[in-house]
Structures are given as structure tokens and as C-alpha cells.
């Protein structure tokens, strides 16, 4: 039935939302549609995180699944209540926040309890079931390998890891553009990594983001320098990617010639 189809879709988005938010320790708010983040930001307060997350794509936020890793109070609830959404998830809610959020019908309001993410994933495939390890690896700053002449600052490392967490939970091929711990835009589910980047750049510009000083994260390596060329033209000068292509040197050489900093993780996140 149509109702059961909606419920199934919500469950899939809820699962994706919980997996994504588990990556972040700072106050963070995320908005998801069809298992991908269309908005996410980390800020000192939940209210500021919500506002920054919504800025990334207020159009796609319509009908989305919202999640935060901090309790929601009345002030946050009043802001969230201004848009149409299907599901909101938080560790807790104040009484007056619930009074606000329950004003509109057919909303699903969930409390996320502390529980470990299961290490295995199961997926039906042809006449059987595919069992695989869940991608739970989290890169650390000291594991990033600088491969360009230009280095990265501590602030840029924070943005690089922020973007890398998002791209890890985005459908491949995926590119994420972020700045000051705010998603500017992403290109997801593309058959070409170049198309994913072009999609992200166009989307960021359409919502008024200045990409100068933004970082780019890719969920897999660059076999050619075309992605760093497009990123450079857009104003991006800091990149994180797994590396591992036989032609890594082509992208590294372009970065060195154009003042771009690049780090490699050695870990490919390839969500299907």
C-alpha cells in the first residue's frame, strides 16, 4: 500500500540518519532525503546548527528527516516547526518543545537511545543475502597523508574530516563541498565523479555559497586531474580523497602547480 511504502522509506531514512549523526561529537543537526544529507552543520549550539544545516538546501529540506545529537528545546522546536518534515530524531525533548512539535499531525517524533551501530549489514541479493562489514572506520587527523607541497591548517583539517564524514554516508559516486563545518552542497549517486562535482558546485552557487576557502571530499580516488581542475576553478583549494589510483600523480601535480592542498586517507568509502 501507499502507506506502507511511505513507512518503509522513512525507516530507511531513519537508519541513514542515525548512522550519519553517530560520526559527530559537536552539536550537529542534519537533514536527510532519500538516505543522503541535503543539509548538515556543526555549531556551538543546536539552534545555530539547525539554521546552518537548513541554509545548505532549504528546498530539499521539505519533507525530510531531521536529526540532532543534542536535546531539542522550545527555541529549536519553534524554528524547526517552520518547515514541513516527516520525522525528527533527538536524544531528548523539553516538554514545551514537544508541545510545539506535536501541533502538526502525522509527524513522527523519535528519541534516539544510546545503542551501538551493528557491525554487520544484510542485503537481499538475487536468491540470497549479502552479508558485509559495515563501514565504521573514522579517520583521525594524524592519519591524513599530505601529498602536496601546500600543507593544511588545523581549521582546514577540521573541515576536511567534517566533509569526509558526510561523503562516507552519501551514495556513490559522491562529492561533498563544505566550509566552516557546514555542508555547502553535495553531488551524490552519479555515474561520473566529474558529474557529481559539477552538480555540487552548481547547487552551492544556486544557494549563494561562496566556495572560496571551501574544502572538497571525494569517496573514491581521482583517476584524472579533471576534478581538481573544476574544484580549483570554483575557488576550492583544499581536498581530501582516499588516493590509490595509478595516476594519483596527475592530480597531485595539478595541485602543486595551482596552490592546492591535498591529503589522502588510504580508505575508500564507497556507499552503494
Feature roles, as predicted:
Residues 31-33, 67-69, 112, 178-179:
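Short beta-strand segments
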Residues 60-121, 243, 252-270:
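Phosphate/diphosphate-binding loops
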Residues 66-67, 73-82, 207-248:
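Cysteine/selenocysteine-centered motifs that mediate thiol-based redox chemistry or coordinate metal-sulfur cofactors
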Residues 51, 110-157:
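Long, charged amphipathic helices and adjacent flexible linkers at domain junctions
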Residues 2-7:
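Short, small-residue-biased leader/transition segments that mark boundaries at the very start
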Residues 151-170:
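Short, basic/aromatic recognition patches
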Residues 38-59, 176, 182-228:
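Glycine- and Gly-Pro-enriched alpha-helical subdomains that act as flexible
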Amino acid at each position: 500500500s501507499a502507506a506502507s511504502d511511505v513507512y518503509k522509506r522513512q525507516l530507511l531514512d531513519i537508519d541513514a540518519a542515525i548512522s550519519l549523526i553517530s560520526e559527530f561529537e559537536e552539536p550537529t543537526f542534519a537533514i536527510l532525503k532519500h538516505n543522503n544529507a541535503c543539509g548538515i552543520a556543526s555549531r556551538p549550539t543546536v539552534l545555530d546548527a539547525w539554521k546552518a544545516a537548513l541554509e545548505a538546501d532549504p528546498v530539499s529540506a521539505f519533507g525530510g528527516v531531521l536529526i540532532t545529537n543534542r536535546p531539542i528545546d522550545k527555541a529549536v522546536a519553534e524554528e524547526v516547526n517552520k518547515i514541513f518534515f516527516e520525522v525528527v530524531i533527538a536524544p531528548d525533548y523539553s516538554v514545551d518543545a514537544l508541545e510545539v512539535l506535536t501541533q502538526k499531525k502525522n509527524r513522527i517524533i523519535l528519541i534516539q537511545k544510546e545503542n551501538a551501530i551493528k557491525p554487520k549489514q544484510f542485503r537481499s541479493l538475487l536468491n540470497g543475502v549479502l552479508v558485509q562489514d559495515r563501514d565504521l572506520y573514522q579517520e583521525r587527523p594524524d592519519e591524513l597523508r599530505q601529498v602536496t607541497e601546500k600543507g593544511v591548517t588545523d581549521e582546514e583539517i577540521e573541515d576536511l574530516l567534517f566533509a569526509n564524514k558526510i561523503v562516507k554516508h552519501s551514495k556513490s559516486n559522491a562529492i561533498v563541498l563544505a566550509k566552516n563545518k557546514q555542508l555547502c552542497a553535495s553531488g551524490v549517486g552519479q555515474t561520473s565523479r566529474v558529474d557529481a562535482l559539477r552538480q555540487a558546485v552548481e547547487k552551492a552557487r544556486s544557494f549563494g555559497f561562496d566556495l572560496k576557502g571551501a574544502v572538497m571530499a571525494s569517496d573514491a580516488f581521482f583517476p584524472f586531474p579533471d576534478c581538481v581542475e573544476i574544484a580549483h576553478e570554483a575557488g576550492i583549494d583544499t581536498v581530501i580523497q582516499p588516493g590509490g589510483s595509478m595516476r594519483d600523480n596527475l592530480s597531485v601535480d595539478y595541485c602543486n602547480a595551482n596552490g592546492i592542498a591535498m591529503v589522502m586517507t588510504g580508505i575508500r568509502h564507497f556507499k552503494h
